Amino acid sequence: MFGDEYDVYEGIEITIGDENIRCPIKYQDERTPFSPQSPYAIAKLAAHHACRLYRESYGLFTCSGILFNHESPRRGEKFVTRKITKWIGEFVRWRNRIDSQLIDVSSDENDVLKISPKELEGDGRVTDTFPKLRLGNLDAHRDWGHAKDYVRAMWMMMQHDKPDDYVVATGESHTIREFLDEAFFAMNYDGGWEDLVVIDPKFYRPSEVDYLNGVYDKIETALDWKPKYAFEDLVAEMVEEDL
């Protein structure tokens, strides 16, 4: 709820249509059919239609933001972006316990990283372990933006003289592989991340949306909004916060 009692904002997040995503059209805008893929998305879609109903039938100032994935260092740890950056921070702290020049990194049958420092004084050796990063579908495409940009869009919707519904997105789609590339680059890791990641089927979603790429032309034209944060800067900020 924003402003006076007649101003309502509802953020629908991603429920835009899977039937469109699986066809050659590789973008989604306000005209794309909705196709919610989870109970959460179904509930958000109901709220979206409620906002439209109260606006069109009762003249209330209600807006819905159709928000594509928006991230920041405050993102919950169960979401894949923050899961990756938090794991990187923990991995760096683990690795720094021993001079990285002295360790041999391998993995055992349980997909656990193992460091073996060079021979210490005497016959003793120290062994320590750290779990690999377990992820699902690395080829899923997402349109990731910075939460600061999206909150600015919400505020601008509520300041406009006419209520409406808008897609809020970046217009760029990146895979989880690309997120990993940027995240490990941001931590200055000098090896490939492929040996540090395990593909775990339990992290595959039963109703996966393969491709998301939002078109924000409408909100740019009506409100002069566009994203300020680049994908690379967003990832770097999240990694830096977790280091």
Predicted regions and their residues:
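C-terminal substrate-binding subdomain of Rossmann-fold SDR/epimerase-dehydratase oxidoreductases
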Residues: D18, C23, D29, R75-L243
